[in-house]
């Protein structure tokens, strides 16, 4: 092999090795920031046909409904304990902080945190979900007419 071909081969190999190393480092950095989404039943019984359960200590997000009657607040701190459920199971969540305004029993919620035990999540963040018809209380009050009713229809049946 001639000297120019050898130099070109080494340059190509160096570029390929550099690209592989860069991709490997990027994937390693991203893997620590990935939080997989689970439902309570997937945490308890596994995901899909593989029945793969999240590992204890894994960062994840759990989404479901807040079980009515399950919210317990600590009077000495901001700690809140509640249960998130779906059709097939429920998991307990502990969160230390201010809950969102939309957080209510029977309402949808997504908790992001770490799986402590098989059925308990220590949440770092709690997001309240709502449907597309949500109206903030202040706007709803401003839009409603007297006695809590919407304004009457105007000309041609249009709402005022």
UniProtKB/Swiss-Prot annotation:
Residues 30-160 are periplasmic. GO terms for cellular component: plasma membrane. Its main location: membrane. InterPro entries: CcmE, CcmE-like_sf, NA-bd_OB-fold. It holds the Pfam family CcmE. Heme binds at residues 130, 134. Gene3D superfamilies: Nucleic acid-binding proteins. Keywords: Cell inner membrane, Cell membrane, Cytochrome c-type biogenesis, Heme, Iron, Membrane, Metal-binding, Signal-anchor, Transmembrane, Transmembrane helix. One of its GO terms (molecular function) is heme binding. The keyword Transmembrane helix applies. Residues 1-8 are cytoplasmic. It is found in: Cell inner membrane. It comes from the Bacteria. Coiled coil: none annotated. The chain crosses the membrane at residues 9-29. The keyword tRNA-binding does not apply. One of its GO terms (biological process) is cytochrome complex assembly. NCBIfam families: PRK13165.1, PRK13254.1-1, PRK13254.1-3. Belongs to the CcmE/CycJ family. Heme chaperone required for the biogenesis of c-type cytochromes. Transiently binds heme delivered by CcmC and transfers the heme to apo-cytochromes in a process facilitated by CcmF and CcmH. This is Cytochrome c-type biogenesis protein CcmE. It comes from Pectobacterium atrosepticum (strain SCRI 1043 / ATCC BAA-672). The gene is ccmE.
